[in-house]
């Protein structure tokens, strides 16, 4: 009687047999289906030579090919796939035509975690850093495809065609069976793709590789919102109408993080304004934290002693609790992530390192708007983020910096430092931005800031009483200037937790900060008592408030009114002169850009501005 075989052999005997073998007998296909699309079915398979599990992709030729031209096109694309070698492009091993069964088969690497869409649905809590890593990998693959001559266009990029190895955090672009090579005119002439991810120019049948950037933006939108783009539409015709009309998916408005939203908007912008994959890879949004620049500021030590000084609500989007949101800006230990000896850009004071450190980043939204991000970290490693748009036509660095100082409990001297950093960021995008503008307008902004505080007091009081919109723990509030911001620390809670700032000497300070109990005629603003101008001190003609530094200052109302009116007239005239000069500069630029194709003007202007800024910096002693 033969001996009983070990259990391991029984398991081997139960292994499924190959349903099909390739002509070389190297690859065997199982019946297990890994995925299925409109034209293609993906089976689990095995490479007997290397001992690897692989994916067997099978396309029914009769389903998509009607003539020899179509067949030759697919053959050429399959041959193309064999030449693609990149870490973020799916590996292609072999292919052949099965005339008997009317199939085209090709073997690719298999992925343990399925598609990016499946992976994202499975893992609900993903940090924004992970999304950035995925984005960098996808864009890296697109850079490789688009750098071919002529470029390779995917034309059907979506989360269902991006694959994941979850144990390595690795993503790769796949399903390149629909890719095409651009002709000599560098444009394609066929509509192929998924409507939700198709750029407007695809419908016009005149497009280039930038359609993949649009699709990438829609992929990122789906990853952030868990919604298919244009899910509000019930059919492809409705999607086509919205896309043709320039209407963005409704899910875009649901994104709370303004940085994420603006980055997606860059990707799905009009073709003439859309950035390339290489340009997007260099975008500040995707930059590693190690590339950030840190500016130490002299902190208000009196204010920092307050119990809640590191948790105050500051700016338009504030992330305090790093564990409270699934997709968020990481605010972990600042000391561990960003050693100050490597990243400090400039130092105002030898003791500055013991105070707050601020990171300044910027993104150009359009010709008139720059999105600024300030990250403030204290000596304990706690960090706070402020996001706000800067309108180069309406805002000045001094006005924004003055408001920030009040919100952040910094010293009055820090106004100039913050303004200079804002100016530096703006000049990175607009080299001819007038540095002296902030100095010239400083007096005007300071004078008006007092009036604005007085006039806006009633308005902000009403806003505080209104039911605020709440989403994911963030409460929408308003600054005195009218700007909106979002905070997970409602204003009234902060007012109760912060101690008021005391001046270093007795009496009224020049910046209007009073000692506690010096007067009851103050309004608490994020822990800082700000002296509001007395209505009688506001000139009725000019509306400019004068803040007295001593009881005897400006006793003569006529002198005050005369000085105020003359000063306002002068500042208004200077501002108009700057506006005229800015308009002239803009017109001069437009004249030169007429020699550049319209779809390349924005890209050319941005590139030349950066070069001009580099030249200006190199010319400085």
From Swiss-Prot:
This chain's source organism reads: Oryza sativa subsp. japonica
Source organism superkingdom: Eukaryota
- Which keywords accompany this UniProt record? ATP-binding, Kinase, Nucleotide-binding, Serine/threonine-protein kinase, Transferase
| Residues covered by the Protein kinase domain | 28-286
Q: Which cysteines are joined by disulfide bonds?
A: none
A GO BP entry is: intracellular signal transduction
Q: Which reaction does it catalyse?
A: L-seryl-[protein] + ATP = O-phospho-L-seryl-[protein] + ADP + H(+); L-threonyl-[protein] + ATP = O-phospho-L-threonyl-[protein] + ADP + H(+)
Active-site residues annotated for this sequence: 175
The EC number(s) this enzyme carries: 2.7.11.1
Which Gene Ontology molecular function entries are recorded, alphabetically?
ATP binding; protein serine kinase activity; protein serine/threonine kinase activity
Tell me any Pfam family this protein matches.
OSR1_C
Q: What is the lineage of its organism?
A: Eukaryota, Viridiplantae, Streptophyta, Embryophyta, Tracheophyta
Protein residues bound to ATP: 108-111, 158
Spell out the protein name for this chain. Answer: Probable serine/threonine-protein kinase WNK2
Q: Can you list the GO cellular component terms from the UniProt entry?
A: cytoplasm
Concerning its family, UniProt says: Belongs to the protein kinase superfamily. Ser/Thr protein kinase family. WNK subfamily.
Q: Which Gene3D superfamilies match?
A: Phosphatidylinositol 3-kinase Catalytic Subunit, Chain A, domain 1, Phosphorylase Kinase, domain 1, Transferase(Phosphotransferase) domain 1
Under the heading CDD domains, the entry gives:
STKc_WNK
The protein's matches in InterPro entries, at most eight in alphabetical order, are given as:
Kinase-like_dom_sf, Kinase_OSR1/WNK_CCT, Prot_kinase_dom, Ser/Thr_kinase_AS, WNK_Ser-Thr_kinase
Annotated segments matching region Disordered:
438-490, 501-520, 527-553, 600-621
């Amino acid at each position: 009687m033969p001996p009983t075989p070990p259990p391991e052999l029984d398991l081997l005997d139960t292994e499924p047999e190959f349903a099909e073998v390739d002509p070389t007998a190297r690859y065997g296909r199982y019946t297990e289906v890994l995925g299925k699309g409109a034209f293609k079915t993906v089976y689990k398979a095995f490479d007997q030579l290397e001992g690897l599990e692989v994916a067997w992709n099978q396309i029914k030729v009769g389903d998509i090919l009607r003539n020899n031209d179509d067949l030759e096109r697919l053959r050429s694309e399959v041959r193309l796939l064999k030449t693609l070698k990149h870490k973020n492009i799916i590996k292609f091993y072999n292919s052949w035509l099965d005339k008997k069964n009317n199939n085209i088969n090709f073997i690719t690497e298999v992925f343990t975690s399925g598609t990016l869409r499946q992976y994202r649905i499975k893992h609900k809590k993903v940090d924004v850093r992970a999304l950035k890593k995925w984005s960098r990998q996808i864009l890296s693959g697109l850079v490789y495809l688009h750098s071919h001559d002529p470029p390779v266009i995917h034309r059907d990029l979506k989360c269902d065609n991006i694959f994941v190895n979850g144990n390595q955090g690795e993503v790769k672009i796949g399903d390149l069976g629909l890719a095409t090579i651009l002709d000599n005119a560098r444009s394609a002439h066929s509509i192929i793709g998924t409507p939700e991810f198709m750029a407007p120019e695809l419908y016009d049948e005149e497009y280039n590789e930038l359609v993949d950037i649009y699709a990438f933006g829609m992929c990122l939108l789906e990853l952030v919102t868990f919604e298919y783009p244009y899910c509000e539409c019930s059919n492809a015709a409705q999607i086509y109408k919205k896309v043709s009309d320039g209407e963005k998916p409704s899910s875009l408005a649901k994104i709370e993080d303004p940085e994420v939203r603006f980055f997606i908007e860059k990707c799905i912008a009009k073709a003439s304004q859309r950035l390339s994959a290489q340009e997007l890879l260099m975008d500040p949004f995707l930059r590693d934290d190690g590339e950030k620049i840190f500016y130490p500021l002299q902190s208000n030590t009196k204010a920092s002693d307050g119990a809640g000084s590191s948790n105050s609500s500051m700016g338009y989007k504030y992330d305090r609790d790093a564990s409270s949101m699934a997709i968020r800006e990481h605010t972990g230990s600042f000391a561990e992530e960003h050693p100050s000896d490597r990243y400090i850009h400039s130092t105002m004071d030898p003791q500055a390192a013991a105070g707050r450190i601020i990171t300044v980043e910027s993104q150009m939204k359009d010709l008139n708007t720059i999105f600024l991000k300030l990250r403030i970290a204290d000596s304990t490693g706690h960090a706070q983020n402020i996001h706000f748009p800067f309108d180069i036509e309406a805002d000045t660095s001094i006005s924004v910096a003055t408001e920030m100082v009040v919100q952040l409990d910094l010293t009055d001297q820090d106004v100039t430092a913050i303004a200079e950093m804002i100016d530096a960021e703006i000049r990175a995008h607009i080299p001819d931005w007038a540095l002296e503008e902030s100095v010239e307008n400083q007096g005007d902004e300071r004078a008006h800031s007092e009036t604005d505080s007085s006039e806006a007091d009633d308005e902000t009081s009403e806003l505080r009483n209104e039911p605020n919109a709440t989403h994911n723990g963030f409460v929408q509030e308003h600054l005195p200037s009218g700007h909106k911001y979002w905070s997970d620390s409602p204003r009234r809670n902060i007012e109760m937790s912060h101690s008021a700032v005391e001046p270093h000497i007795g009496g009224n300070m020049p910046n209007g900060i009073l000692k506690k109990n010096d007067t009851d005629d103050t309004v608490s603003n994020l822990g800082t008592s700000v002296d509001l101008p007395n209505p009688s001190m506001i000139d009725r003609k000019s509306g400019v408030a004068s803040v007295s530094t001593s009881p005897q200052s400006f006793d003569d109302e006529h002198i005050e009114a005369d000085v105020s009116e003359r000063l306002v007239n002068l500042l208004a005239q200077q501002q108009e002169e700057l506006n005229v000069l800015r308009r002239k500069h803009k017109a001069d630029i437009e004249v030169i850009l007429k020699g550049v194709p319209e779809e390349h003007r924005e890209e050319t202007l941005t590139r030349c501005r950066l070069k001009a800024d580099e030249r200006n910096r190199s010319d400085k002693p």
